[in-house]
Structures are given as C-alpha cells and as structure tokens.
Amino acid sequence: MRCPFCGGPDTQVKDSRPSEDSSAIRRRRVCPDCGGRFTTFERVQLRELVVLKRSGKRVPFDRDKLQRSIDVALRKRTVDPERVERLVSGITRRLESGGEGEVTSEAIGEAVMEGLKGLDDVAYVRFASVYKNFREAQDFQDLLGTLGERLEGEGDLPEDGEAAPAPPDEVVAAPRRGRPARKRA
C-alpha cells in the first residue's frame, strides 16, 4: 500500500486485528521511507453495489457517504461510535446480501431511518427532515406524532433501560452549584 505521507510504494503492517464486531480488519502500518504511521481498515465486500438515484443516474455505492450522512444526523449527540459502526455495517451487509446488484437511494434512506429510529430519536428526526424534504412545521409535527405514538406503546422505560424523565409538571429545580449565596446584612 502506498504511503499517504510521502507516496512511498511500500508500507509494512505492524499490527493487525479484527474490529469489535469482526466486520473489518484494522491494520497499523508504517512507511520504511519516512517513518509515517497510519491505520487502514479492510472490509469484506460481498458485491459491487450500484445506487439508482431519483434522477435515474447510477453511481457506485459509497459506504463512507453512508457513514457521513449518519454522522451528520448524529452531530452533537452522545451515541457510542461502536453502535454507529454496527449500524453502518448492518445496513451495508443488508444491502449487499439483498440479491440485487442495484439498490435505490430510497431503499438506503429507509434503511437509515429505520436504524436511526432505534438508535437516537433526535438523529432520526434530523435525517427524516432532510430525506423527506420537510417544507413546513406541520411535517415535523406529523413525524413527531408518529414518534410519540411509538414511544407511548413501549411502556414506562425507554429502550436503554433508564428511567423515563419526569413529566414537565413534576420537574423539580436542580440544586445550585458553586458557593452558597452570601447573606446580606
């Protein structure tokens, strides 16, 4: 493999191990010419997928683009990167093993929405607003209504097993942090 730093033709593998979910092999490499160190990931590709876009254009499937779109939806959300990687790998595997060499952009979008719905509600709404091209507030209200119905049907505990937040009328103000206020004389 060519060195990304100096362009040297050969690099040496120093360490090789499977990723957490065994969907990829992580390799640490070093360049003998410049001493640069970098990491590569090797993944199994079941078949070459072609994405059929809404415009009718055909483009090669890009796993990195899928990862980036999910990362954008999850920006500033505290979701474990391993869970995100499992989601991306699962969607990719499902698409590759679907039997068809071509997959529609709609099928990819629906798979991402389904995955985000189980991962993070805010990211789900963000992605849906772009994917479904929301134009007005009513579009958000409709989506939030279906999301609320889903949450009501799950019972008292959210998916992660933590206690549900208190309803707004039962919220108690948190104690102040820092030094206590001085009494004025």
Curated annotation (Swiss-Prot):
GO terms under biological process: negative regulation of DNA-templated transcription
Keywords annotated in UniProt: ATP-binding, DNA-binding, Metal-binding, Nucleotide-binding, Repressor, Transcription, Transcription regulation, Zinc, Zinc-finger
Record keyword Transcription present: yes
The protein's required cofactors: Zn(2+)
Region (Disordered): 1-24, 149-185
Textual note on the cofactor: Binds 1 zinc ion.
Domain ATP-cone, first and last residues per copy: 49-139
Pfam families recorded: ATP-cone (PF03477), Zn_ribbon_NrdR (PF22811)
GO terms assigned for molecular function: ATP binding; DNA binding; zinc ion binding
Chain intervals with Basic residues compositional bias: 176-185
unnamed zinc finger locations on the chain: 3-34
Annotated Basic and acidic residues bias: 12-24
Assigned protein family: Belongs to the NrdR family.
HAMAP family: NrdR (MF_00440)
Function noted in UniProt: Negatively regulates transcription of bacterial ribonucleotide reductase nrd genes and operons by binding to NrdR-boxes.
Protein name (Swiss-Prot/TrEMBL): Transcriptional repressor NrdR
Source organism of this protein record: Methylorubrum extorquens (strain PA1)
